[in-house]
Amino acid sequence: MIDTKQLIKAGEEKMTFAIEYLDEQLSHIRAGKANPKILDCVKVMYYGAPVPLTNVATVTVPDARTIMITPWEKKIIRDIEKGILDSELGITPENNGEVIRLGIPPLTEERRRQLVKQCKQEAENAKISVRNARRDAIEALKKSIKSDGVPEDVEKDAEAEVQKIHDKFIKKIDELYAAKEKEVMTV
């Protein structure tokens, strides 16, 4: 006898992963104000190896339009600057020899619309992942139920449970997208 709860839980875990991934991707999209997460993709050459910026410097946000980077070793300040320029963030670093300041320029209307499109694409990718997880869970349920000769009503109940979980996650994706869209479009 199969445990339908286990199969449903496995599908739910895949859906949860899709939501967490979407949340992370949306946090990397800048919304006109300083957010240190936009620097997560920056790699710095440190003793010949690329390492994340946060491994070689402290990143702080002194005000809404500035990110300040304080390297732990002063000699790598040029490497940090190069890493920021190479990451194509569209932000020019200001280096005073001690710290690097990144002035976050206000977003133009056109750039805001591009970012909203990017957010929408990320949300759509998450929805696809959730739908695939639902499909996989339902297929696993059908396969297991068919091989064990379980009554049809148990199968229908399990499918309904998977669908309910799916709908909850799709709603959550829509909420995350709407919140990010509002954040990006707010001047």
UniProtKB/Swiss-Prot annotation:
Transmembrane segments annotated in the record for this chain: none
Molecular function GO labels: ribosomal large subunit binding
UniProt-listed CDD domains: RRF
Database matches in Pfam families: RRF
Keywords: Cytoplasm, Protein biosynthesis
GO biological process terms, semicolon-separated: translational termination
GO cellular component, one term: cytoplasm
InterPro entries: Ribosome_recyc_fac, Ribosome_recyc_fac_dom, RRF_sf
Subcellular location: Cytoplasm
HAMAP family to which the protein is assigned, alphabetical: RRF
Family: Belongs to the RRF family.
Function recorded in the entry: Responsible for the release of ribosomes from messenger RNA at the termination of protein biosynthesis. May increase the efficiency of translation by recycling ribosomes from one round of translation to another.
Protein name: Ribosome-recycling factor
UniProt organism field: Parabacteroides distasonis (strain ATCC 8503 / DSM 20701 / CIP 104284 / JCM 5825 / NCTC 11152)
Gene name of the encoded protein: frr
